[in-house]
């Protein structure tokens, strides 16, 4: 578990990610929420609805199950931050972590559930109006990115944001993070990537 790479380097981030994966895996195995091979487990999740850059989504009746990789997050803790932020900002579409595992390639995966919603697509203008109404400013229309000084919100397009039959706007998937200066979206927050683990 030694961190040998220089601080603030990409290699250090990767090392921290591996340490976090190892600790989460150990805990998840002890508590019964670990899946050795999510590729095999997928057969019991339901019909495959969609597959994106990081997730495979399965039909589970009134909910969907998502098996999500860390493609956009080197460290598991940052993905878990993303879930917490999503749940804080978009309560109607909360995600709940069910467990953790690895796929057949050995990649670390997080398994979540989310209520299934139906509705109609919104225009980009409607999404922009909604997002600005909840306090965000459009900073990059090419990748649907909005921000406040503290929060970065991206991927707000019409496959991830829609209006339900009840008229409510539902954000089912987005890239939401603490807005740091490195994201180049007016961010003022800082994050520490150092995590201290206490050995049992």
Residue ranges of predicted features:
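ATP-binding glycine-rich phosphate-binding loop
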Residues: 1-63
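ATP-binding glycine-rich loop module of kinase domains
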Residues: 42-91
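Protein kinase-like catalytic core scaffold
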Residues: 63, 110-112, 152, 170
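Active-site ExK catalytic segment of metal-dependent nucleases
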Residues: 64-71, 115-117, 173-175
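Catalytic activation segment of kinase domains across protein kinase-like and atypical kinase folds
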Residues: 70, 146-200
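Active-site-adjacent loop/helix micro-motif of nuclease/hydrolase catalytic cores
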Residues: 72-81, 122-127, 180-186
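Conserved structural core of kinase catalytic domains
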Residues: 87, 92-142
């Amino acid at each position: 578990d030694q961190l040998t790479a220089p601080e603030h380097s990409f290699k250090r981030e990767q090392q921290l990610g591996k340490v976090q994966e190892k600790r989460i895996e150990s805990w998840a195995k002890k508590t019964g929420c670990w899946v050795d091979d999510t590729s095999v487990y997928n057969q019991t999740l339901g019909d495959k609805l969609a597959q994106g850059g990081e997730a495979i989504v399965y039909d589970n009746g009134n909910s969907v199950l998502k098996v999500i990789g860390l493609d956009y997050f080197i460290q598991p803790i940052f993905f878990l931050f993303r879930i917490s932020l999503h749940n804080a900002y978009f309560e109607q579409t909360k995600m709940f972590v069910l467990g953790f595992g690895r796929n057949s390639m050995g990649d670390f995966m997080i398994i979540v559930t989310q209520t299934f919603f139906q509705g109609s697509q919104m225009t980009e203008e409607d999404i922009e109006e909604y997002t600005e109404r909840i306090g965000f400013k459009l900073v990059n229309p090419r990748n649907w990115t909005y921000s406040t000084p503290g929060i970065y919100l991206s991927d707000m397009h019409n496959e991830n944001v829609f209006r339900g039959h009840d008229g409510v706007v539902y954000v089912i998937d987005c890239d939401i993070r603490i807005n740091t200066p490195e994201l180049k979206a007016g961010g003022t927050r800082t994050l520490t990537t150092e995590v201290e683990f206490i050995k049992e």
